[in-house]
Amino acid sequence: MMKTVFFGTPDFAVPTLEALLGHPDIDVLAVVSQPDRRRGRGSKLIPSPVKEVAVQAGIPVWQPERVKRCQETLAKLKNCQADFFVVVAYGQLLSPEILVMPRLGCVNVHGSLLPKYRGAAPLQWAIANGETETGVTTMLMDEGMDTGAMLLKTTTPIGLMDNLTAIGDRLARSGAELLVQTLKDLDAGQLQPIPQTETEATYAPLLKKGDFVINWHRSALEIHNQVRGFAPACHTAWGEQILKIISTVPLGAEFFPLLPEKYQDLATAYLNYSLEAGEPGNIIGTIKNWGPVLETGNGHLLLEQVQPPGKKPQSGWDFINGNRSTISFA
């Protein structure tokens, strides 16, 4: 029986915890998660998704503000005498004191093909940068930020219309399977850790407010990648208001073969449509049942789904029908 302590916080970490809880050869001794946070109306304290799963399973949950400084939690972790600490999107760095506690090490599930996209937002930046492939890497943790020796990898393609939610869900499931296999192989002495090549490392920093602002002078593909990579947070100025851009479709013969079947009617309509000329950020036409087409710095972009202030998300077609006056986001 492999004794583990699980460190994790968001939805992305839940499938891995569930896989550990459901495995007959793995004993989850405790879960460490970020403290409950106040959210929503009434500012109620909301537990993390990982905590909710652990509580339902009857597993002890520890929630220190700073795990490396909480003597009570450190003592509990040491007393566990675990074989592994498993870390998935926990949200805090582990101290050297913690890293040496488990018998076989601290194993991290990272949402990228290391050494590419080390850091806090690997999925977001992989999509925003237009990568066509990503994946999950398990690694033995060291004191650095995602710099530990690699164990196993699994890959997944990124389609032109895949967004953060779709890729995140896919990697969460594949990462859970990969983690279980990693623990089994490590326990059996069948894995040889592979050091990362520093010269190949790239980074995925925390997102800043400016990352969500759309610059219409960029190309249609760059804006599309930004929107789907940082979904659903990208936005543009709309008069004196802010319009959230939830999803887009890049238009052009080079993109249509890469679009799912449901967009083929859109492709046909676009190729048969006479568009006006315009400056980046101008609406240069409307495709029936789909929505407005915008000029960008290079190419045309359809607004598939948007969210006006104070309203629920709506299709680009509904948005344009409700705002018939001239609209520009320039």
Curated annotation (Swiss-Prot):
Q: What are the record keywords, sorted? A: Protein biosynthesis, Transferase
Catalysed reaction(s)?
L-methionyl-tRNA(fMet) + (6R)-10-formyltetrahydrofolate = N-formyl-L-methionyl-tRNA(fMet) + (6S)-5,6,7,8-tetrahydrofolate + H(+)
UniProt-annotated binding residues for (6S)-5,6,7,8-tetrahydrofolate: 112-115
Kindly list the biological process annotations in GO that this record carries: 'de novo' IMP biosynthetic process
Any one of the GO CC terms: cytosol
According to the UniProt entry, what is the EC number of this protein?
Answer: 2.1.2.9
Q: Which SUPFAM superfamilies match?
A: FMT C-terminal domain-like, Formyltransferase
**What is the designated name of this protein?**
Methionyl-tRNA formyltransferase
The Swiss-Prot or TrEMBL record describes its family as follows:
Belongs to the Fmt family.
Functional summary from the UniProt entry: Attaches a formyl group to the free amino group of methionyl-tRNA(fMet). The formyl group appears to play a dual role in the initiator identity of N-formylmethionyl-tRNA by promoting its recognition by IF2 and preventing the misappropriation of this tRNA by the elongation apparatus.
Query: Does Protein biosynthesis count among this protein's keywords?
Result: yes
Q: Does the keyword Transferase apply?
A: yes
What organism is this sequence from? Synechocystis sp. (strain ATCC 27184 / PCC 6803 / Kazusa)
> What is an example of a GO molecular function annotated in this UniProt entry?
methionyl-tRNA formyltransferase activity
